[in-house]
């Protein structure tokens, strides 16, 4: 490698960001990990994201929002890695995100209140023992260790978020969207995290409420409500705002994007 690791990453990111405009442009500086709020609280309190196997070993799993069949078909060795995506709003996230009617939940894949941890692309790739893939780990993709192979990835497919035609490219694009960066066992938030994104003021307030006082002080200025476009799919029901006025509770909802959840929810206060 003619350039050192730091120089290579600077050069690569400059070239990558020049290829994309709008939403995808800021993705070139970031890596993404989404999980349900219950898991997010544990991550923040522990100061790190653990691999799936480590989370189970430490009994820290609060909400297993993964698809049963995907987990079943994932090599157990791959479960020893923390998994980050190159871009948000992946097909998996779209399938899992939001409060959904029971008849719309497939194989227990459900993330009612998603929290997005946004990491610094360069800082992650400067860590030791970083690997990355050209597809979903569950599909046994190519796994690379040498960062020069970043040049082999097709970011036009990885960042593709347009409507998918039912043709031979569909499965290839879906798999590419799930290209990952993997970190052995655990990933520290400190020095690597850019910010945490949530969907609404209500979800931000709830997340902060659930944190310990010390973590609340540390993270209250790092949690933002949809600071950039494209982080969440916003397809399903969620609470946008909650206010209390003269003993009256007011809840403002973000409604479903279609009629498939009409009349299927009950609210208990």
Please identify what each model-predicted range represents.
Residues 2-269:
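Active-site-proximal loop/hinge segments that shape catalytic or ion-binding/gating pockets
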């Amino acid at each position: 490698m003619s350039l050192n690791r730091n120089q290579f990453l600077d050069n690569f990111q400059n070239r990558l960001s020049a290829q994309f405009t709008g939403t995808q442009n800021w993705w070139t500086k970031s890596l993404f990990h989404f999980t349900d709020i219950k898991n997010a609280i544990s991550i923040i309190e522990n100061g790190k994201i653990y691999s799936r196997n480590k989370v189970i070993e430490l009994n820290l799993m609060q909400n297993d929002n993964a698809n049963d069949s995907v987990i079943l078909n994932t090599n157990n060795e791959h479960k020893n890695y923390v998994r980050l995506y190159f871009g948000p709003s992946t097909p998996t996230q779209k399938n899992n995100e939001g409060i959904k009617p029971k008849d719309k939940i497939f194989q227990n894949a459900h993330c009612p209140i998603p929290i997005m941890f946004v990491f610094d692309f360069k800082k992650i790739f400067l860590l030791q023992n970083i690997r990355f893939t050209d597809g979903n780990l569950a599909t046994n993709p190519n796994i690379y260790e040498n960062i020069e192979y970043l040049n082999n990835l097709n970011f036009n497919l990885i960042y593709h978020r347009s409507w998918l035609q039912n043709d031979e490219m569909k499965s290839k694009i879906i798999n590419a969207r799930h290209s990952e960066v993997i970190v052995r066992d655990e990933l520290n938030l400190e020095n690597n995290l850019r910010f945490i994104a949530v969907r609404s003021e209500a979800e931000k307030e709830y997340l902060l409420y659930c944190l310990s006082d010390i973590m609340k002080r540390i993270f209250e200025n790092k949690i933002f409500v949809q600071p950039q476009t494209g982080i969440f799919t916003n397809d399903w029901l969620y609470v946008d705002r909650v206010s209390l006025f003269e003993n009256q509770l007011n809840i403002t909802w973000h409604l479903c994007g279609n009629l498939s959840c009409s009349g299927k929810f009950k609210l208990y206060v």
